[in-house]
Amino acid sequence: MASDWDKWFELRLAVGRGVVLRDVQLWQRRGSSSSRPASHTGLTGRLLQAISLDRLPVWAGRSNSYRCFSSSTTTRAFFAAKLLRRRHRARGLVVELAPTRASKEYLIFHKELGADSHFELCCFTLDLSRKHALDAALKPVLPAARIDTLVLRSGARRRAAENRQDPANTSDARQRFVARLSQCILGGLRLRAVPQARYEKLYRAVFQASEFAFRDELAASADVPFEALQDCVETLLKLFTRS
């Protein structure tokens, strides 16, 4: 590694289906104003979802930019497939770090075009200070954790009722659709300054509208691409929240 870079963290990243990526190294340019960590190792996180960096809300700030490296061929192959294709122009991967303090922390991995015209894997810390200020001003009716629980329980009851009515809804295509759609909606709601009292109502409205939008694909048991679901959810959230 070039002498003007220092390793800041070494991350173990759970990406789903029991797969854990090791040796995800985060490096910062020497002379950075960030406080140096006491240890390079022991940091863990889990992949939440893919997003479009062009659609980050205005309150989402950036801090602590890193360059990412790895000696693991599996880790490099994963990020190459998820981020470094030319079609992934503005894609980002949201990672939730294992809590080390009262508030949660998130990293967003993305690509940048390097000086040698090759794409470089980078990431930054998602700065939520402005969102926390907005949340405090909104004076939520219910704690966020309880609302998340209500939304998940509501979705589980809905899926259970659908499965009782029609056994065909247990197909792999349907299950993947529901899981991906729920992931997109929950991620989109968390990345917006949505009043807590509207959280569950918005979730249901976007879920039902998305189901209607892809009714032909569901009827044919066709697999709906993640990017198509994300675009649909983002459009609906913009419509319902005017953001």
UniProtKB/Swiss-Prot annotation:
One of its GO terms (cellular component) is spindle pole. One of its GO terms (biological process) is regulation of DNA-templated DNA replication initiation. Keywords: Cell cycle, Cytoplasm, Cytoskeleton, DNA replication, Nucleus. It is found in: Nucleus; Cytoplasm, Cytoskeleton, Spindle pole. It holds the Pfam family Sld7_C. Its main location: nucleus. Required for the proper initiation of DNA replication. Required for mitochondrial morphology. Belongs to the SLD7 family. This is Mitochondrial morphogenesis protein SLD7. It comes from Eremothecium gossypii (strain ATCC 10895 / CBS 109.51 / FGSC 9923 / NRRL Y-1056) (Yeast). The gene is SLD7.
